[in-house]
Amino acid sequence: MSEADARPSNFIRQIIDKDLADGKHTSVHTRFPPEPNGYLHIGHAKSICLNFGIAQDYQGKCNLRFDDTNPEKEDIEYVESIKNDVSWLGFEWDDEICYSSNYFDKLYEYAVELINKGLAYVDELSPEQIREYRGTLTAPGKPSPYRDRSAEENLALFEKMRDGGFEEGKACLRAKIDMASSFMVMRDPVLYRVRFASHHQTGDKWCIYPMYDFTHCISDALEGITHSICTLEFMDNRRLYDWVLDNITIDCRPHQYEFSRLNLEYTVMSKRKLNQLVTEKLVNGWDDPRMPTISGLRRRGFTPASIREFCKRIGVTKQENMIEFSSLESCIRDDLNENAPRAMAVLDPVKLVIENFPAGEVENLTVANHPNKPEMGEREVPFSREIWIEREDFREEANKKYKRLVLGSEVRLRGAYVIKAERVEKDDEGNITTIFCTYDSETLGVNPADGRKVRGVIHWVSADKGVPAEIRLYDRLFTVPNPAAADDFASTINPESLTVMNGFVEPSLVEAEAEKGYQFERMGYFCADSKDSSKEHLVFNRTVGLRDTWAKIEAK
């Protein structure tokens, strides 16, 4: 199979293949242009993987460009966060980072060119009046009384705007296109507005700022972008994209292509809704592991490879659809099953005493870090007379389907011996406080010599050497597949999206790296929290369970 055959195919790549074959372009140049007014989420990851992935596969270039034309909502904090997210996902931008603000002087010149051609005018209608004059989807708009000013007058007024001679909302520059167009975006859209706001790149040089639709296409052309790829909500904007480039003097002529945005079940992607979750403290910040932000997914334990694989699996189409959350979970589960070292942790502990094991003695057992990858090495796990096991792994009575520890029966401890439950001790309320067992000292790594069958295998942690840990069990943030469709999306938040437990982990996990994935035997995949975990207070986040438990719930 050739390298080209191995690439994922989609309609955008087919367009690129044809453009190259026809000689329309000799190379491919894409861009990822986020606005630095928030944190990137999994939907942005799809665009990142698409644009940077195309550049990689076609030996082309991809620019990271910040669409920084709205200084009131933007911050250098978001610039740094976005750079970190793109880099963490495994991509490198071409040359230096680009900013739309780098082109403010050129954009101003192109606006002047449109004015000179009679294709732009300064409007002094209020924002409310502009909306009123624009009309509706079923009724045409009506022209502004300022629409037919001369080029000379418009140039003077535009210069006055630039020099701070108008208050905010008192004047704007509009394109002169068609107030009766069936496309609202073509009804004399605003190109520049007055904003007395300091900019994180240009400081106080400007008090007028260009709109996205005017900036975007010109930035693409100035950077030599061959394929400008965006989501479907910008389909109508392509008409304005083309109109601007058709009416200014510029060499490069990029074209815009649209694909469907990512809609993921049990989450929201709207920046406004995500911001509401944070500001109303419904979650613990933008990097809360329940959030769909890249920083949140990273803190939860998702790997760059798993997110790239997810974006590859869902593909690129023009069809709007809702992707199952289990598809994302499947990608990280596959990744960690293959690559995560194993460890033992007890989340809901009950004490177990092995009465015939020497008191005060600790035996260091050698356990493989991965059952199928000997190259991942081994570790020592301390074994002692008193250990912790999961409360759910013991019953006084059980049917034959229960393959764990039952009073009077045997079970194997993972990586250790076969034990038999002899008796229990309870508190005044009837809760089991201690399980007393005996062990077969001849069963380390081998089956019982007499051939007797053992019911199953359970995990454990030494009570003497185990380390206390806070365990955070994360689940889906919402209880319904499409919370954005609810009248009050916040009312659909899952009250069990976070459960905190206090358990014990094997001592090797004291050295666990933040965000590095581990499979806690029989419990799921976890990582040390990057913000709250320390050697003095271990905190582990559940990334995903061993199996898709929601599939069973939804099937009922």
UniProtKB/Swiss-Prot annotation:
**Top-level taxon of the source organism:** Bacteria
A GO cellular component annotation here is:
cytosol
Per the record, the major location class is: cytoplasm
Family matches, as InterPro entries: aa-tRNA-synth_I_CS, Gln-tRNA-synth, Gln/Glu-tRNA_Ligase, Gln_tRNA_ligase_bac, Glu/Gln-tRNA-synth, Glu/Gln-tRNA-synth_Ib_cat-dom, Glu/Gln-tRNA-synth_Ib_codon-bd, Glu_tRNA_lig_a-bdl
Q: What CDD domains does the database record attribute to this sequence?
A: GlnRS_core
- Keyword field: Aminoacyl-tRNA synthetase, ATP-binding, Cytoplasm, Ligase, Nucleotide-binding, Protein biosynthesis
Q: What is its EC number?
A: 6.1.1.18
Motif placement: 'KMSKS' region = 268-272
Q: Which GO terms describe its biological process?
A: glutaminyl-tRNA aminoacylation; glutamyl-tRNA aminoacylation
Residues engaged in binding ATP? 35-37, 41-47, 231, 261-262, 269-271
What PROSITE patterns does this protein's entry cite? AA_TRNA_LIGASE_I
State the Gene Ontology terms under molecular function: ATP binding; glutamine-tRNA ligase activity
What top-tier enzyme class does this entry carry? ligase
Q: Does the keyword Transit peptide apply?
A: no
Catalytic reactions of this protein: tRNA(Gln) + L-glutamine + ATP = L-glutaminyl-tRNA(Gln) + AMP + diphosphate
Record-listed L-glutamine binding positions: 67, 212
Q: Which Gene3D superfamilies match?
A: Glutamyl-trna Synthetase, Domain 2, Glutamyl-tRNA Synthetase, Domain 3, HUPs, Ribosomal Protein L25, Chain P
Q: Where in this protein would one find the motif 'HIGH' region, according to its record?
A: 34-44
- Give the NCBIfam families listed for this entry: glnS, PRK14703.1
Q: How does it assemble?
A: Monomer.
Q: What is this protein called?
A: Glutamine--tRNA ligase
* Origin species: Vibrio vulnificus (strain YJ016)
